[in-house]
Amino acid sequence: MANTSSAKKATRKIARRTAVNKSRRTQMRGSVRTVEEAIASGDRDAAVKALANAEPALMRAAQRNIVHKNAASRKVSRLASRIAQLGK
């Protein structure tokens, strides 16, 4: 438990930031899930469109330190390679 007033304020700030980050992380995961569902259904056009929406969401999350930038880039790369395999 925080004892000083500054520690109590820091706890409140952390709670607010956690809520914002949780929302952004959920939004990011939802966009990735849309791409994965399109890939699973075999619909290449839908997957490409979904990836066009998911990539900026992932990069925004990386920019805001919700996920590491390398993790975001790796996720985009793996999704793109899976979409490329749909065409074969």
From Swiss-Prot:
BP GO annotations: translation
InterPro entries referenced in this protein's UniProt entry, alphabetically: Ribosomal_bS20 (IPR002583), Ribosomal_bS20_sf (IPR036510)
Gene3D superfamilies according to UniProt: Ribosomal protein S20
Keywords assigned by UniProt, alphabetized: Ribonucleoprotein, Ribosomal protein, RNA-binding, rRNA-binding
Annotated Gene Ontology cellular component terms: cytosol; small ribosomal subunit
Name of this chain's protein: Small ribosomal subunit protein bS20
Family: Belongs to the bacterial ribosomal protein bS20 family.
NCBIfam families according to UniProt: S20 (TIGR00029)
Annotated transmembrane regions: none
Described function: Binds directly to 16S ribosomal RNA.
Protein's UniProt keywords contain Cell membrane: no
